[in-house]
Amino acid sequence: MNRYDELKKHIEENAKLAYDLNYAVAADPELSGCEYRACARYVELCRQMGWPVEENFTKQKTAFRAVVTRPEKAVLKVALMAEYDALPDIGHGCGHSANGAMSFLAAAALSKVKDLPVQIDLIGTPDEELRGGKAVMVKEGVFKDYDLALMIHISSDRTEPNSEVLALSCYRVVFHGQTAHGAHDPWKGRNALNGAMLALHAVDMLRQHVRPETRIGTYIVDGGTASNVVPDRAELECTLRYTSRPYLNEVVEKFMNCIKGAALATETTYEVTPVGLDFDDMVWNKAATEVSASVLTDMGIEYMMPDGSNGSSDVGNVSHQCPALQLYLAAGDTYYPG
């Protein structure tokens, strides 16, 4: 029996566990950093498989690391990454319930392969949609000792042997002013919403002067409470992306100047708070991508190479610490954005 046939056999033997895990997590969505029940399901399954599990991994309450294989003469050390956080309103519309289940299935199948000289860990990486659980792990140096970290991300209609992701920085900006009655004495007020709106106009003008691949998204979180009251507080959320971190840092500096100038012009004050950790762009691993593509070909799965990214993921951070791979696997043949 060759390796593929052996793996196929073990995949089929463990498929129901993975299916049940996927559907259980999908039916019980938990937001980023709050995936307590999902994490507990993974930990229980790992222990049923006989794998030692470290909970609260890197001091993240919904993260874990399970030791899947520890051969005496390992030539490689590989991390399989499992995601399981959901989004507000749409639950597991991004497919993280399936992402994690596929990593578990891969671990379960590989753990049964005889004489496999590879040390394998299954790492539960929560909070991808907000703070970036993998980014936290990178800061702790978790992936320095791995030869490869990989996962599969479900896709609507495209299968790709690897993915490109954009560097991302996200901020909450709060403007503070002075409230006043909008008819009686508005001149006594300092309009925080004016500061926020002027900042948005400045950011819109900035778009002409940044590279075409730059993406800037904004929305008003809080703009006041009544039209006859000068608002003393306004809040924005702003997301900035580019294909590489160094240039994105330049864009962030320009963005901060927009905020600073708007506050100066409206005689308001402001505070800026990062939303989660910075996500980095993906370091493209040619060798791993070629192997991934050859496996897809051997399995008769049609694929396309990435043609530019419009999304971000903390797997990009991982790729700056060790070789990393994130395949996209099509779930259907109709494109859905997101």
Model-based region annotation:
Residues 2-116:
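Acidic/His- and Gly-rich active-site-bordering loop/insert found
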Residues 25, 137, 238:
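Residue-level signal for inorganic ion chemistry
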Residues 28-33, 128, 158, 224-227, ...:
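Short, small-residue-enriched loops and turns at beta-alpha junctions
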Residues 62-63, 67-68, 85-93, 97-104, ...:
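Histidine/acidic-residue-rich, glycine-tolerant segments that coordinate divalent metal ions
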Residues 76, 145-148, 300:
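Local beta-strand N-terminus motif with an aromatic residue
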Residues 78, 123, 148-150, 323-327:
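Hydrophobic/aromatic beta-strand patches that form the interior of the parallel beta-sheet core
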Residues 79-81, 171, 176, 325-332:
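Non-cysteine beta-strand/loop elements that form the S-adenosyl-L-methionine
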Residues 197-338:
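Metal-dependent amide/peptide-bond hydrolase catalytic core
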